[in-house]
């Protein structure tokens, strides 16, 4: 296993994925890290899969996992399970909304921390997403502990060895496992580092969950987050 595994779920990002992978590869190489980018294609219906396969053929540090569509949460959870042997796991989404500029801040502070995460700023989200973010934060703070601010931020670096026991207990169909993991960081009193990361609007593609479906998904994820808390303790 490499020292760092980047878990990157992708769904219908044909227009962005080549640029995103190029940016992250350049940033990681500049830091001289022993890394692998594991790209999980979650049943994309556009040209995403052939695009990432072409890139992977030229770069052995990019691994492609093609899987049936199951959703963002189950996909990143599979990525975590597949790479529990890595010293570090970093999760980032493939839409380009969070760039690699602040990764060096996380990586350079890793020796003193167990869980390092971004706090999205300049985020131009619709009211519906802001509401679900507030609710998610409240649930995690209430049931796990008030520590991580941006509880669902897909810009997180952590030591899987400290979370392995719990990661394997999270149900595979969990909608937002990152909420639970942020809660675990607080409950287990991990050493947590947080830093602001600039959020930019996506230039291609579109969000997969909108309006009423977003609230239904948020309700399900909050329920799963609460139930896991009582299941484990």
Feature map (PLM): residue ranges:
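Hydrophobic helical membrane-anchoring modules
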Residues: 1-3, 169-233
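Short loop->beta transition adjacent to catalytic acidic/histidine clusters or analogous donor-positioning motifs
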Residues: 2-5, 25-38, 47, 60-62
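Conserved sequence signature across two-component system core domains
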Residues: 10-11, 38-42
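Donor nucleotide-sugar binding loop of glycosyltransferases
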Residues: 13-16, 44, 72
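Short, well-formed alpha-helical segments that are part of the catalytic scaffolds
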Residues: 13-28
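Conserved donor nucleotide-binding strand/loop of the catalytic core
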Residues: 35-38, 49-82
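A conserved acidic beta->alpha catalytic loop
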Residues: 41-50, 96
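Acceptor/aglycone-binding surface of glycosyltransferases and processive sugar-polymer synthases
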Residues: 67-83, 88-91, 99-175, 202-212, ...
């Amino acid at each position: 296993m490499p020292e760092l595994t980047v878990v990157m779920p992708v769904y219908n990002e044909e227009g962005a994925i080549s640029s995103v992978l190029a940016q992250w590869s350049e940033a990681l190489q500049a830091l001289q890290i022993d890394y692998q980018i594991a790209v999980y294609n979650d049943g994309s219906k556009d040209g995403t899969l052939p695009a990432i396969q072409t890139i992977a053929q030229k770069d052995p540090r990019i691994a492609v996992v093609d899987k049936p569509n199951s959703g963002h949460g189950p996909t990143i959870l599979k990525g975590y399970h597949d790479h529990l042997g890595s010293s570090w796991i970093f999760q980032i989404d493939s839409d380009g909304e969070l760039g690699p500029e602040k990764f060096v801040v996380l990586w350079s502070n890793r020796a003193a921390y167990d869980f390092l995460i971004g706090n999205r700023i300049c985020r131009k989200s619709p009211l519906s997403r802001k509401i679900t973010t507030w609710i998610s934060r409240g649930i995690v703070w209430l049931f796990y502990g008030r520590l991580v601010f941006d509880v669902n931020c897909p810009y997180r670096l952590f030591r899987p060895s400290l979370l392995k026991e719990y990661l394997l207990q999270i149900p595979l169909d969990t909608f937002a496992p990152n909420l639970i993991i942020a809660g675990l960081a607080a409950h287990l009193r991990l050493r947590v580092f947080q830093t602001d990361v600039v959020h930019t609007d996506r230039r291609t593609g579109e969000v997969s969950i909108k309006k009423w479906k977003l609230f239904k998904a948020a309700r399900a994820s909050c329920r799963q987050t609460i139930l896991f808390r009582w299941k484990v303790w």
